[in-house]
Curated annotation (Swiss-Prot):
Function field: Catalyzes the conversion of glucosamine-6-phosphate to glucosamine-1-phosphate. Does not display phosphoglucomutase (PGM) or phosphomannomutase (PMM) activities.
Gene field: glmM
Catalytic machinery residues: 96 (phosphoserine intermediate)
Key words of the record: Isomerase, Magnesium, Metal-binding, Phosphoprotein
Entry-annotated residues carrying Phosphoserine: 96
Gene Ontology molecular functions: magnesium ion binding; phosphoglucosamine mutase activity; phosphomannomutase activity
Cofactor note: Binds 1 Mg(2+) ion per subunit.
Protein name: Probable phosphoglucosamine mutase
Length: 449
């Protein structure tokens, strides 16, 4: 992690570390880095969004950069608008699935991919130097407002085709996805039942679309006898899915299903995922001609590998999917349309999910101050190799150790002051045993850091 940017841009509590002053610096630094041109900016529904967005815009304009403000806009719409308007970069004001007191700044390249860590380090260097470009009064950037949502929907309709109509329960989580996702589903010919569709920074449910937060969605699917339930986080870069029986579909299972559908749709090829993805993905995709490539956690790492290898699909076991034939921006809205196309072609998700191997996956979050993370990881890496009998080791992001029918990943969060443990085993008893050892190891390492 850098001084300001983590694994998913800047993401901090508003008016603590993320202040209008810092946002102004980001705008000035980005404008200086670009040296001119045009930038698209949008925000999610957080109460601090206008404050941060206005500061970033001011910084950009002061360097002579033209700004297109698309207002309340999910991250996928910002990524689409960058290409639509021929912009040199994009900015999303969002903290994605974090609690409402957080906000963030994420910067996107002209191709829709997030800024790499190297590019973010350059922005940080400019921010700290204070050596910003200063446009004279007659060369200040121009500001205009636009709404690319209709163009987004029309473009998506050319890509996704349904032969039948379905009942879809859609939970936007009071986030920015509410201004696009329900409308796309209706244009596809589906009957849409909306939950939490009013844009608000006072979120009704936890934003991360998981089994716990989507209990109301699951119940509604059952009561309404819907074909599927779809949910988004605050900026709709993620998707959560509830099947036709009203059961939340685990991230790993859904990732396997949609990756398999993409292989059927576009032919065999490379599927990019992250080090926290389990064995099921490999086992399910191998017969379909899929070669799984693992990389660091974060959509920018997935997008980068997709671009390098010409991959068919990329995704994380967190509901973050990238469809390279569409864009290199993670897109939960377009993903929702693809889920309906998969159902239309292959059948109900409850039946499809039976084909995906099921292993026991456990996750834990251990509080860890950001300043202790580096030292704690040194201790964890050293002690883990002594504690566990392992056959394989992956250290591209944290440390992942493997031994036949199990694996454990230790990694510091890039967006929160926590240490993450993710593990998978074929047997539940073994998984619990491993997690017990792993949690004790991490807590001890943090106390010694």
């Amino acid at each position: 992690m850098g001084k300001y940017f983590g694994t998913s841009g800047i993401r901090e509590v508003f008016n603590e570390k993320l202040t209008p002053e810092l946002a102004l610096k980001v705008g000035k630094a980005l404008g200086t880095y670009l040296g001119g041109g045009k930038v698209v900016i949008g925000k999610d529904t957080r109460t601090s969004g206008d404050v941060i967005k206005s500061a970033v815009i001011s910084g950009l304009l002061s360097t002579g950069v033209d700004v297109i403000d698309i207002g309340l806009a999910p991250t996928p719409l910002t990524g689409f608008a960058i290409k639509l308007y021929g912009a040199d970069a994009g900015v999303t004001i969002t903290a994605s699935h974090n609690p409402p007191e957080y906000n963030g700044i994420k910067v996107w390249q002209a191709n829709g991919m997030a800024y790499t860590s190297e590019m973010e380090r350059e922005l940080e260097s400019i921010m700290d130097s204070g050596n910003f470009k200063k446009a004279p009064w007659n060369e200040i950037g121009t500001l205009r407002r636009a709404d690319p949502s209709e163009e987004y929907i029309n473009a998506a309709l050319k890509f996704v085709k349904l032969e039948n109509s379905y009942t879809v329960v859609l939970d936007s989580g009071n986030g920015a996805g509410s201004v696009v996702s329900p409308y796309l589903q209706r244009e596809l010919g589906n009957r849409v039942i909306s939950l939490n569709s009013h844009p608000s920074g006072f979120f009704v449910r936890e934003l991360e679309p998981n089994a716990k937060s989507l209990s109301a969605l699951a119940k509604t699917v059952r009561v309404m006898k819907a074909d599927v339930g779809i949910a988004h986080d605050g900026d709709a870069d993620r998707i959560g899915v509830v099947d036709d029986q009203g059961n939340f579909v685990e991230y790993e299972v859904m990732l396997s299903l949609i990756a398999g559908y993409m292989l059927r749709k576009f032919g065999k090829g490379k599927i990019v995922t992250t080090v926290d993805a389990g064995f099921a993905l490999d086992d399910y995709l191998r017969p379909l001609g899929g070669e799984v490539i693992r990389t660091r956690v974060g959509d920018v790492a997935v997008a980068d590998e997709l671009a390098k290898h010409g991959g068919v699909f990329g995704g994380e076991p967190s509901g973050t999917w990238i469809i390279p034939q569409w864009n290199l921006t993670p897109d939960g809205i377009f993903a929702g349309a693809l889920v309906l196309e998969m159902i239309d072609r292959l059948g109900p998700i409850s039946e499809l999910a039976k084909e995906v191997p099921r292993y026991v996956t456990l996750r834990a979050k251990i509080p860890c101050p950001n300043e202790k993370k580096a030292k704690a990881m040194e201790i964890i890496a050293r002690e883990a190799l002594k504690t566990f009998d392992y056959e394989g080791l992956i250290d591209i992001d944290g440390i992942r150790i493997e031994n036949g029918d199990w694996w454990i990943l230790f990694r510091p969060s890039g967006t929160e002051p926590i240490m993450r443990i993710t593990l998978e085993a074929h047997e539940e008893e073994k998984a619990k045993e491993l997690m017990g050892k792993a949690e004790r190891l991490v807590k001890k390492a943090i106390s010694e850091a």
